[in-house]
Swiss-Prot record:
Cited NCBIfam families: hacA_fam, IPMI_arch, LEU2, PRK00402.1
EC identifiers of the protein: 4.2.1.33
Name recorded for this polypeptide: 3-isopropylmalate dehydratase large subunit
Pathway named in the protein's UniProt entry: Amino-acid biosynthesis; L-leucine biosynthesis; L-leucine from 3-methyl-2-oxobutanoate: step 2/4
Reported function: Catalyzes the isomerization between 2-isopropylmalate and 3-isopropylmalate, via the formation of 2-isopropylmaleate.
Cofactor(s) needed for function: [4Fe-4S] cluster
InterPro entries: Acnase/IPM_dHydase_lsu_aba_1/3, Acoase/IPM_deHydtase_lsu_aba, Aconitase_4Fe-4S_BS, Aconitase_4Fe-4S_dom, HAcnase/IPMdehydase_lsu_prok, Homoacnase/IPMdehydase_lsu, IPM_dehydratase_rel_enz, IPMI_cat
Similarity comment: family membership: Belongs to the aconitase/IPM isomerase family. LeuC type 2 subfamily.
Catalytic activity: (2R,3S)-3-isopropylmalate = (2S)-2-isopropylmalate
Gene this protein is translated from: leuC
GO molecular function terms listed in the Swiss-Prot or TrEMBL record: 3-isopropylmalate dehydratase activity; 4 iron, 4 sulfur cluster binding; metal ion binding
SUPFAM superfamilies: Aconitase iron-sulfur domain
Organism for this UniProt entry: Clostridium acetobutylicum (strain ATCC 824 / DSM 792 / JCM 1419 / IAM 19013 / LMG 5710 / NBRC 13948 / NRRL B-527 / VKM B-1787 / 2291 / W)
Keywords, alphabetical: 4Fe-4S, Amino-acid biosynthesis, Branched-chain amino acid biosynthesis, Iron, Iron-sulfur, Leucine biosynthesis, Lyase, Metal-binding
Length: 422
């Protein structure tokens, strides 16, 4: 009799050529995509060159996205990008994305149809878990793992245990995927899902857009998880239309699959949520925030730089001005999102409100460039991490929130609910 498995276990078993896997088992799985960026790929290239091979395992299944320090912020980052550009050309890697066609990797990869339901994907970036929104097993790895993946098309894994999140009910207005995942991390902690799979189910999924799901899956790593994953449904299938010719594979968890925990969440009871410094678990609902003034507002990133995020922010900012002295930085997730935001008039809205709109980049999120904080400064940001010094000076502060709360806070000059400015 076949033993029951979770979504993640079924995908891993399929890619390992096994009928069944269980938590804790060590396996070797075939990979559908190996991903790197301009920070992690140079190290992977050096490791690759020591492996005695001159070819990547599949020119179509390696993707390199220069996004962290691009457009190049200094000579060192320019040299890194030159190195990986030459490597991609020499290995005839088809999915190397130059800055004119690039985006923040975890917004770009799904947009380009390179993540397909049922895939196993590794990326030398911790937020590779984003693609779980599409029913993909995807996880971050080190640069040497990326090198081995590029050479062999394989990676080894310890099959994770799973936590089942049963989402029920309809979220209230202004409650988004960001608020849901911040609520979850606040509840279980930054190590609450350590090396576990966060698997989402329940009737509440029908109210979550694909952009909401990308946000929730993106921040699985902030709870210490190996991956986050959603079941494939009509919304997934609709999103994938026209993006890939590859077969979509649906792996549903067995009803009697084993979970280390089952957590039920009534989405209708949630409120807009803010993570205070210096951990994503340090959450408060918007009515508990109090008087917190901010210097900078950042809207974008691989967490919240998609069209729905920009539309929500623009709907609050339209016809209004941000408070004098506040710096508003908006960075769309990809060039296509940027273009669509221009065509819809969202870019005009942001600029007329007093903000700037940046090319797609990871820059501000990791304290790299395009919006660094000085000593004592405070930012509210739609990004995913608020560790000490994450966005600049060690004595600066980062508050994590949704695009709606961030946009409202830009107008008020302090952290507020959208209702307070509308």
């Amino acid at each position: 009799m076949k033993k029951p498995m979770t979504m993640t276990q079924k995908i891993l078993a399929n890619h390992a050529g096994l009928d069944y896997v269980e938590a804790g088992q060590l396996i070797t799985a075939n990979l559908d995509l190996v991903l790197g960026n301009d920070v992690t790929t140079p190290v992977a290239v050096k490791a690759f060159k020591t492996m005695g091979t001159n070819k990547v395992f599949d020119k179509k299944k390696v993707a390199i996205v220069p996004d962290h320090f691009t457009p190049n912020k200094d000579i060192k980052s320019a040299e890194h990008c030159k190195m990986i550009r030459q490597f991609a050309k020499s290995k005839e890697i088809e999915n190397y994305f130059e800055i004119g066609e690039m985006g923040i990797e975890h917004a770009l990869i799904p947009e380009k149809g390179l993540a397909v339901p049922g895939d196993v994907i590794i990326g030398a970036d911790s937020h590779t878990c984003t693609y779980g929104a599409l029913g993909v097993f995807s996880t971050g790895v080190g640069s040497t793992d990326m090198a081995v993946g590029m050479a062999t098309g394989k990676a080894w894994f310890k099959v994770p245990e799973a936590i089942k999140f049963v989402l029920k009910g309809k979220p209230a207005k202004w409650v988004s995927g960001k608020d849901i995942i911040l609520h979850i991390i606040g509840m279980i902690g930054v190590d609450g899902a350590l090396y576990k799979s966060m698997e989402y189910t329940g009737d509440g999924l029908e109210y979550l857009s694909m952009d909401d799901r990308f946000t929730i899956a993106n921040m699985a790593i902030e709870a210490g998880a190996k991956n986050g994953i959603f079941p494939v449904d009509e919304k997934t299938i609709e999103y994938m239309k026209g993006r890939s010719d590859r077969e979509l594979k649906k792996f549903d968890a067995d009803e009697d699959a084993e979970y280390s925990r089952v957590i039920e969440i009534d989405l209708s009871t949630l409120k807009p949520t803010v993570a205070f410094p210096h951990l994503p678990e340090n959450t408060k609902t918007i009515d508990q925030v109090g008087e917190v003034n901010v210097d900078q507002v950042v809207i974008g990133s691989c967490t919240n730089g998609r069209m729905e995020d920009l539309r929500i922010a623009a709907s609050i900012l339209k016809g209004k001005k941000i408070k004098k002295g506040i710096r508003l930085i908006v960075f769309p997730g990809t060039q296509n999102i940027y273009l669509e935001a221009m065509e819809e008039g969202l870019v005009r809205t942001f600029i007329e409100a007093g903000g700037i709109v940046s090319t797609p980049t990871c820059g501000p999120c990791l304290g790299g460039h395009m919006g660094i904080l000085a000593e004592g400064e405070r930012a509210i940001s739609t990004t995913n991490r608020n560790f000490v010094g994450r966005m600049g000076h060690p004595k600066s502060e980062v508050y994590l929130a949704s695009p709606a709360v961030a946009a409202a806070s830009a107008i008020a000059g302090k952290i507020v609910s959208p209702e307070e400015v509308l």
